[in-house]
């Protein structure tokens, strides 16, 4: 099965300026992400960026880069520009790999692509079980509920589904029904072309979750349970230190 991995890599970051070029074990973070995507077996791995320094780092590492505009509101919009610039066919499977996930397992990059190829949804993603009550009630951990076929019913920052009987007694323990959404997506290129023409939905603006636009317009998202949990993503300087420590413990200094 053939698929293309695209890594949106925005240079500007409020909490961590120049994040794609942050040094991790002697290499820029974006190069680590690119290597993980290449190990997934993707036919092509393309870094989409708006900054010449990121372009230079990717080319220096032997990667493929596509320069995009700087005014995109989301990674999906940047993805759509790459789809048009590269002229991908509507049936081509595109995996959106977050540019701040240097520890993402190659296995799950391939898994989400294979998941999309097997179903009739325009979009597929992954989730992992939640076992900790604090995570279930953390608004930064996005929860998802699915139907009997694995299609998303809703994504929320709230604790869903609400276990009425259990939580009436205590909210310190949760059952086995919670899933945390992982921010990796697979789409067919034709779906991306349609998606960027849809106006933002009320629900996505309330929850600040872009994927809710898909459900709002009546499209399906298939959600599989990830074969492997993703590693630490990099949003803050503390996250960056954590990733550096993990790789150092693995002998990458």
Swiss-Prot record:
Check the record and name the PANTHER family matching this protein.
3-DEOXY-MANNO-OCTULOSONATE CYTIDYLYLTRANSFERASE (PTHR42866), 3-DEOXY-MANNO-OCTULOSONATE CYTIDYLYLTRANSFERASE, MITOCHONDRIAL (PTHR42866:SF2)
Q: Which GO terms describe its cellular component?
A: cytosol
Protein name per Swiss-Prot or TrEMBL: 3-deoxy-manno-octulosonate cytidylyltransferase
The family database entries (InterPro entries) matched by this protein are listed as:
Cytidylyl_trans (IPR003329), KdsB (IPR004528), Nucleotide-diphossugar_trans (IPR029044)
Where does the protein principally reside?
Answer: cytoplasm
Q: Which GO terms describe its biological process?
A: CMP-keto-3-deoxy-D-manno-octulosonic acid biosynthetic process; lipopolysaccharide biosynthetic process
Q: In which pathway does it act?
A: Nucleotide-sugar biosynthesis; CMP-3-deoxy-D-manno-octulosonate biosynthesis; CMP-3-deoxy-D-manno-octulosonate from 3-deoxy-D-manno-octulosonate and CTP: step 1/1; Bacterial outer membrane biogenesis; lipopolysaccharide biosynthesis
Q: Which family does it belong to?
A: Belongs to the KdsB family.
What are the EC numbers?
2.7.7.38
Q: Which domain of life is it from?
A: Bacteria
What keywords does the record list, in alphabetical order? Cytoplasm, Lipopolysaccharide biosynthesis, Nucleotidyltransferase, Transferase
Q: Any S-S bridges, and between which cysteines?
A: none
Molecular function terms, GO-annotated: 3-deoxy-manno-octulosonate cytidylyltransferase activity
Free-text function comment from the UniProt entry: Activates KDO (a required 8-carbon sugar) for incorporation into bacterial lipopolysaccharide in Gram-negative bacteria.
Q: What enzyme class is recorded for this protein? A: transferase
Q: Which SUPFAM superfamilies match?
A: Nucleotide-diphospho-sugar transferases
Reactions catalysed: 3-deoxy-alpha-D-manno-oct-2-ulosonate + CTP = CMP-3-deoxy-beta-D-manno-octulosonate + diphosphate
Tell me where it resides. Cytoplasm
The record's gene field reads kdsB
- Membrane-spanning segments: none
